[in-house]
Design a protein with these regions (language model features):
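ABC ATPase nucleotide-binding domain "signature" loop
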Residues: 1-2
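C-terminal lobe/lid and adjacent interdomain/linker elements of RecA-like ASCE P-loop ATPase modules
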Residues: 5-102
Length: 102
């Protein structure tokens, strides 16, 4: 298991790998998720005694809310939303820096 700075480095490495290959990653770590270009949420629910799994694409707002949920659980607040927005912004800055390298 990784968290904190180690999770951040894993996310950065996955992004660098994605520059030459397609990467699909399932994670509960916001540090890794923030690096992604596309986001999906996987939801499981029971209907009529059967379990169904749905994979739903997230738009910009959905991405922000899902990262906030990873930070703070179901209690999404202005603070968790701000933290998620900052993490997305920091990831974008890192990605731009890497793309500019020769």
């Amino acid at each position: 298991g990784v968290s904190g700075v180690a999770a951040q480095r894993v996310g950065e490495k996955l992004f660098q790998v994605s520059l030459g290959k397609q990467v699909m990653c399932v994670t509960h770590l916001p540090q890794i998720a923030a690096m992604a270009d596309s986001h999906y949420v996987i939801k499981k629910e029971e209907r009529s005694g059967r379990t169904y799994t749905d994979v739903l694409p997230l738009d910009k707002e959905g991405r922000l809310r899902e990262l906030a949920r990873l930070h703070g659980g179901d209690n999404i607040t202005e603070l968790t939303l701000a933290s998620a927005a900052e993490q997305i912004e920091n990831a974008a800055k890192f990605k731009e820096t890497v793309k500019k390298r020769p």
